[in-house]
Structures are given as C-alpha cells and as structure tokens.
C-alpha cells in the first residue's frame, strides 16, 4: 500500500491555481509559470480551494489592480488557516515596486513566496525551497538578467499564441510605472523568435500575436540592429503561419517602414493598437509621449492611406494632472476624427514613484468621472457605427470555440479583430471559415457560416 505523503514533501505531486491581473505580458508569464509547474509534475486546477499552491501574478499599472490583490490575499488567510500546508506565492509587476514586497509580507505574513518580474524563471527552485525547508522566500531582483530562452510554457489556447519579442520599456511616460518594474528594453533575436513560431505551427497553431511593451523599438539593442519592419517580414515568410498580430505600438516609433510592411505582408492582420492617451498636445507633452496631436494624426493618416480597411484601437487616459476642459474637448475631437473601432478608456490613477504622482494640479475625482462617461459615450457610438459597416459582408473568421453567451453558436475573430458569434458547424473549431455578417451589435457581430 502506497504511503500518503504530506503536501509539503518535496516529492509530492500537487495541484496549483494561478490568478492573473494585467496585460498580455502577464498572461504569458502565467503560461510560463504553469508550464514550469506542469514540468515539475503539478496539475492545474481552476478551483482555489483544491490547490496545494496558489499563485497571484500581479499588475500595478492602475490602483484598482493593486486593490484587487489586497482583497484576494485577505480571502486566502482563511484557506491557509484550514490548510497550513497550502503554499501561497505572489509575483508580477506589483511586487517589483520599491518596498512593495516587504509591505505584502508585513500585511500578509502567511504568504510563502514573494518574487518580482526578473526572477520568475527560478520559481520551481523557490517552491522546492519552501517545501523542503518549511521556510518562506522573499527575493526581488533589482536588475533584469539576460533573456531566458526555451522556458516551458502551458498555453491557454490551442490555435492562438502570444510570442514575446522584447521585454521592458525605455520611454518613461510620466504616468507609467512599467519601466521601473519591467526594466530596460531587451530584444530577443529574430532567430529565437522564428524558432518559437515554427514550433507553434508544428503543434497546430494558426495565429501569433507578437508582444512587447513597445514593439516598434524592437531590435535597437541587437548587434547587428534588426528593425521591427524587418522582423515582420521575416515572420510573414514563415511557412504554415496563417495570421500575425502585434501589440503594443508607440506612435513616436511607428515608422513608414512598419506601416508599409503591414500593408504588404499578407499574413499581417489589418488591426493596429495605437495608444494616443490624450488628444491635447499640451497634455501629451506633460505625459512625456514624444509626439503631439498633429504628429499622431499624421501617422493615422498614413495608416489609413496604405491600409484602407484597417481597424484602429487605442488607450486613453482621462483626468491626467492639469487636464482642462479644453484639453478634454481636444481628446473628444481626436476620437471623432480618427474613428477608432474600439478604445480602452481609463481614469488617471496616481502611481507612486512616477513623476506625474508629484504633479500638483490633480483633477478632482468627480470631474474625472464626468469626463470619462462623456468619452465612453462617444467611443461606443463610433464603435457601433464601425461595426454596422460590416453588415452584409463576408468575413474570414478563425473559429475559436463555442460562444460564451450561446452554446448553440460558435465564436471567432475577423482579421480586423472583430468578435463574431455565428451559427455554424462545430467541426469548424480551429479552422478558418467564411461568415456572412447579418447583424452588428455594440461590441460584436452576429453572422452565419456560408
């Protein structure tokens, strides 16, 4: 008869649960954590209560993300009391902030592992250390190491995958914490990127999204230099790959070469996420964005000229310090002029350690909220109009699975990133099909397979 081992025994195979907050980079980091743990013999669970290891992968771009982490850690105290052998780990950008790891350990002493963004690859070692020595680990690496290649990765999707092409950011926008928690820009070699994509294709993947904090800066740190436009062309030539997307682009670095590459490369989807943040040149200067309203609109004009059917999306911050009614009106007018297919709108959130946190002319909360509501109304109106233009058209859709709202329907996305729910054959999941769009909704399209 086999002996039942204590869950803290090093040889025990257990279950793990990961909760992720934040951007696509964080999502991919969680896929790597999952890959490493599965390699160790762990099984993933979607139920916190069943887990032997719980990992929170955190975000600190906005205060709301941090508050969610605090709230969820508070809930875990009860689980830890019921199961003292439960191992709780917190990682990600929030932990990389100066003094945050110590704050978490003080507030939540039951947390076993606290690490940042630069030593994620060592997580299995830290886990084994906790299990073996019945101790806790708090290790925040201040500086980024060289890029770790070939990490195990457990991807959530079997047909679409994220491929990180670079890490970090050198831009230092005055509102943003990212350069402080993700480090300076480091690019992967094109050979390593191509190798990862080829492996994914061999496993049946159809669509790749190239990730970076600012993909347009790709390759500046490589010897010899490789531009993002050159990388796009190389990726486009990979046999068997069907679709390529990328994010995020910084307007100051979106060159004519990149726009031309998107227009000419047949696998590159006609979708560009181009964060504007504000329509006011005055505010953009205070944000340290390195472009003004005119320059941004010039880039948009070039994009629309070369890629007429492009879907543009953006990020907008409402209530940045010093934003006047005139500044906000300029944001509204820019949104109307560009006509974004979608926009991610945010209330300005003070991030400790950033220059903007010290700006004295903070906008009152009630003013921020009123402006936010006005902006969302305009954005949604334009999105609905853009979606309406798809009615009657036939679109190529990569079928991702059954619809979340109706199990009798399938769902997938067009090349321009539009979500389509449609009646079709379930055997089509994982394949490309043509769908006739019969109805436009506020945030999605409805159609039927033809």
Curated annotation (Swiss-Prot):
GO MF annotation terms:
4 iron, 4 sulfur cluster binding; metal ion binding; N6-isopentenyladenosine methylthiotransferase activity
The entry's keywords: 4Fe-4S, Cytoplasm, Iron, Iron-sulfur, Metal-binding, S-adenosyl-L-methionine, Transferase, tRNA processing
Substrates-to-products reaction catalysed: N(6)-dimethylallyladenosine(37) in tRNA + (sulfur carrier)-SH + AH2 + 2 S-adenosyl-L-methionine = 2-methylsulfanyl-N(6)-dimethylallyladenosine(37) in tRNA + (sulfur carrier)-H + 5'-deoxyadenosine + L-methionine + A + S-adenosyl-L-homocysteine + 2 H(+)
Q: Which residues bind [4Fe-4S] cluster 1?
A: 23, 59, 93
Q: Which Pfam families match?
A: Radical_SAM, TRAM, UPF0004
**Cofactor binding summary note:** Binds 2 [4Fe-4S] clusters. One cluster is coordinated with 3 cysteines and an exchangeable S-adenosyl-L-methionine.
Q: Which cofactor does this sequence's record say it needs?
A: [4Fe-4S] cluster
Residues recorded as binding [4Fe-4S] cluster 2, renumbered to this chain, are 169, 173, 176
From what superkingdom does this record's organism come? Answer: Bacteria
Q: Does the keyword Transferase apply?
A: yes
Domain TRAM, by residue range, is: 388-450
Q: Where is the MTTase N-terminal domain?
A: 14-132
Q: Which PROSITE patterns match?
A: MTTASE_N, MTTASE_RADICAL, RADICAL_SAM, TRAM
Please state where this protein is localized: Cytoplasm
Quick one: a GO cellular component term? cytosol
Q: EC number(s)?
A: 2.8.4.3
Predominant location of this chain? cytoplasm
Read off the SMART domains from this record.
Elp3
Family matches, as InterPro entries: Elp3/MiaA/NifB-like_rSAM, Methylthiotransferase, Methylthiotransferase_CS, Methylthiotransferase_N, Methylthiotransferase_N_sf, MiaB_methiolase, rSAM, rSAM_horseshoe
Top EC category = transferase
> Which parts of the sequence belong to the Radical SAM core domain?
155-385
State its role: Catalyzes the methylthiolation of N6-(dimethylallyl)adenosine (i(6)A), leading to the formation of 2-methylthio-N6-(dimethylallyl)adenosine (ms(2)i(6)A) at position 37 in tRNAs that read codons beginning with uridine.
Task: Please report which protein family the annotation says this sequence is part of.
Answer: Belongs to the methylthiotransferase family. MiaB subfamily.
Q: Indicate the quaternary assembly.
A: Monomer.
> Know the name of this protein?
tRNA-2-methylthio-N(6)-dimethylallyladenosine synthase
